[in-house]
């Protein structure tokens, strides 16, 4: 069966997000297991890393929400399915999922979706648009939180013929491994960030957008400084504004208002995130809205770093509170500052124990190999 398995994944853009890296990982796992792997995408930064000998790429405007383009994409997908004798189609986003739904209905192929987020809906029309992710033969939720969200909001689209299940997202624990980084690279990165390693570093990774909680983080830093009476650490806000210039200016003004300009570094991008974690002492995930999975919390634990995260969404599942990290009340700067203070005051033995438990947690539960194997197994089960 496996040699006959031909999987076509469809994703708007192959960037560095969770859905995209999941697509990338599965695409390369399949050929290692004697399967054929195909991706349809509009482009993206990860494309240059795709092994073209193992994975065939088709470039289509599947990022578009234009109904006409969605229809045109569907007919092109039908052609690809028939020419390459595709076994199943796996959609990872809503607009291309509509194209995939039509293409699989016409060709009689199996249809799989991964529900990667909560997909906000303020109207029934938006909810119907979102519902395409539940119209598949197999619906994969990336966490128990997303599983519950689907059951609560999309139950009328589910039936006994459809399988809804959780397959936890996974990360590459060999890349996010604290033993693989070398000291000279750490020094170069700190120099680039204009940081002298005479104080601890608290890192907040994530693109600059209000729900990622940068404002709460800055307010918490101010509260920690007030409590201590001095600046005991550097704070790094690492992430692109992605064109949100006004929001970035707002954050800079807030840091100036609290007189934190010398303490906070705004860094747009870091091509080696494992290294960014390695040079940092405490990692924070400050999201004010629930994340489907929350990669930062998982990557930090894999790097044996203490993680402080808001108590909503996927972090509740990926962090063992008080053992591999700490949860605080989402949106509450005082709650976050208390956790930061507590972690700053911990002795090295306790911090090392938290780090060891964190890595053990990720290797056991959130390893990319486990995610790929589970997905591959479900593909085979669906076709059998």
Name each region found by the language model:
Residues 243-248, 260-270, 276, 326-327:
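Active-site donor-binding acidic/aromatic loop of nucleotide-activated sugar
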Residues 39-45, 171, 205, 234-249:
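Glycosyltransferase donor-sugar binding loop
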Residues 321-322, 326-333, 342-348:
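Conserved acidic donor-binding segment of nucleotide-sugar-dependent glycosyltransferases
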Residues 20-25, 200-226, 249, 334:
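A conserved mid-protein helix/loop that constitutes part of the nucleotide-sugar donor-binding site
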Residues 91-97, 115:
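Short His-centered aromatic/hydrophobic patch
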Residues 335, 342, 349-365, 371-380:
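A short, well-ordered alpha-helix in the C-terminal region of glycosyltransferases
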Residues 136-166, 171-176:
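A short, active-site helix/loop in glycosyltransferases that binds the activated sugar's phosphate group
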Residues 39, 306-309, 319:
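Short hydrophobic beta-strand element within catalytic cores of glycosyltransferases
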């Amino acid at each position: 069966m496996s040699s006959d398995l031909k999987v076509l994944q469809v994703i708007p853009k192959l960037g560095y997000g969770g859905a995209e890296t999941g697509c990338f990982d599965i695409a390369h796992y399949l050929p290692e297991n004697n399967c054929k792997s195909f991706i349809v995408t509009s482009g993206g930064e990860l494309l240059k890393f795709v092994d073209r000998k193992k994975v065939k790429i088709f470039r289509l405007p599947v990022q578009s929400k234009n109904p006409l383009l969605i229809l045109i994409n569907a007919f092109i997908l039908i052609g690809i399915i028939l020419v390459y004798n595709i076994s199943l189609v796996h959609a990872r986003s809503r607009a291309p999922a509509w194209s995939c739904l039509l293409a699989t209905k016409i060709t009689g192929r199996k249809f799989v979706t991964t529900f990667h987020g909560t997909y906000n809906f303020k109207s029934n029309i938006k909810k119907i648009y979102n519902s395409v992710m539940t119209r598949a033969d197999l619906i994969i939720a990336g966490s128990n939180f997303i599983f519950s969200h689907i059951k609560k909001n999309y139950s009328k689209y589910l039936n006994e013929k459809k399988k809804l299940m959780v397959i936890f997202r996974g990360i590459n624990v060999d890349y996010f491994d604290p033993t693989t980084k070398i000291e000279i690279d750490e020094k170069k990165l700190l120099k680039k960030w204009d940081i002298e390693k005479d104080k601890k570093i608290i890192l907040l990774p994530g693109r600059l957008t209000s729900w990622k909680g940068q404002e709460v983080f800055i307010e918490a830093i101010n509260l920690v400084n007030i409590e201590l009476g001095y600046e005991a650490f550097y704070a790094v806000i690492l992430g692109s504004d992605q064109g949100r210039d006004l929001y970035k200016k707002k954050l800079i003004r807030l840091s100036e208002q609290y007189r934190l300009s010398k303490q906070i570094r705004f860094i747009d991008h870091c091509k080696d995130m494992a290294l960014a974690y390695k040079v940092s002492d405490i990692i924070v995930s400050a999201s004010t809205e629930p994340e489907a999975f929350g990669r930062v919390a998982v990557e930090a634990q894999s790097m044996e770093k203490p993680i402080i995260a808001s108590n909503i969404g996927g972090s509740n599942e990926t962090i063992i509170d008080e053992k591999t990290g700490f949860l605080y009340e989402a949106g509450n700067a005082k709650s976050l500052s208390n956790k930061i203070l507590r972690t700053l005051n911990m002795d090295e033995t306790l911090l090392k124990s938290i780090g060891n438990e964190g890595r053990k947690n990720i290797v056991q539960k959130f390893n990319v190999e486990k995610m790929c194997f589970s997905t591959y197994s479900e593909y085979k089960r669906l076709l059998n």
